[in-house]
């Protein structure tokens, strides 16, 4: 169940077919598999062995894919890290993750000089170019003796790679959560977790060797890893790698390469919808699009499908589940606002505070079971025990299921707002506001109130400078119960987002707390 072993088979079946395209350069499956073997051999020659933890601080590039699959091939554990994290965030993950080696962008060399003083246990820094051409590794730095270029590692192998014999429950990857409730936690995913979720996603969506997939979601994010990387690669598909999201580039690539599948977060779909030069003809080869990462407003989904004449299948997942648990069917009725039904081999159910399943239509916590559920959190047995009970992963998301087995995310459990004893789910208010023709983006949070405990506070990005707070509040009064109507509405140039484009409610909450 090691994806790197699967690559041998895929490369044998699709020898000259492009595995990925980057900067208009095609790399065949044979070339990809050979590069993985060479780099894995080079890593082994450096003393990196099965069970060692190795961090990847890279953007979307062939270096990431080759590095990841090389680590799988020698049985080392990969720790993908967002390279745009702050120095403190990166340092924490490298220390907590017991990292032995780092594969990273050359832009981070100054940071590693500082980190090496507090983490001398890191033995190797393998440097990848941030530009198209590779520059020589500096020789006058305090960590120069630990640094090697990506190319030199590929060329420095012994020529006699010993591939690891991994067990299906061995840890393949550690994904650090975004740390919305404190320090990031490392979700340990096994080879079985990764393989099964990629296989089941590919089966559910019908991904095959004829698919050409835009890979623009960050590769260090689990959504991209499974849907836009592992699933296509294990089935002979072709990745078209875009280093950084831009509507112009997505439309260009979709048209040039007859893209059949695009996966993104709702913010990306919103930008594509608003891009004035985007045309339905650009997406004419798309079989469908996939939305995940956060809830997609129903109005956005309908407007996108109508403008571009393409199906958008909304799904659901989380790092701890490798990540996918649900998708809206491609070949059967889809329900706007729903995350769809359980994918094959995965169970989802909604339970109350006692862990008892609730009837259809009733709101409770969504829990998940299947071969995709993580082993646990790295070095955190108590948090693991609180999250996984009797094999069920407690997601922290509030949901309901209808009579036909379709699930609906109501909101994050921690995001629910209690106004005078009444429960208000931010997404419900956001859906109402997003349907307003002059609203581009919206986020809703709870703000402290001395009388009601909490009140609803909204943050919006407007398409029209003339739009007023009073107008929007009146709009909400007509469509929402009184206790759900926003107490105030703030207009912003842009809402805070993480690197995948997900709106950060916690940043807005921090702003409110600082103001109070």
Locate each region found by the language model.
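Conserved AMP-binding/adenylation subdomain of ANL enzymes
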Residues: 195-212, 220-261, 271, 275-276
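ANL superfamily AMP-binding
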Residues: 16-17, 31-55, 86-87, 91, ...
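Gly/Ser/Thr-rich phosphate-binding loop
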Residues: 259-264, 273-334, 347
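AMP-dependent adenylate-forming
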Residues: 5-28
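Structural core segment of the AMP-binding/adenylate-forming
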Residues: 8, 25, 45-46, 66, ...
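AMP-binding/adenylate-forming catalytic core of the ANL superfamily
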Residues: 85, 262, 354, 370, ...
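Conserved pre-ATP/AMP-binding loop-to-beta segment of ANL
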Residues: 16, 126, 145-149, 154-176, ...
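Conserved AMP-binding A3 loop
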Residues: 28-30, 172-196
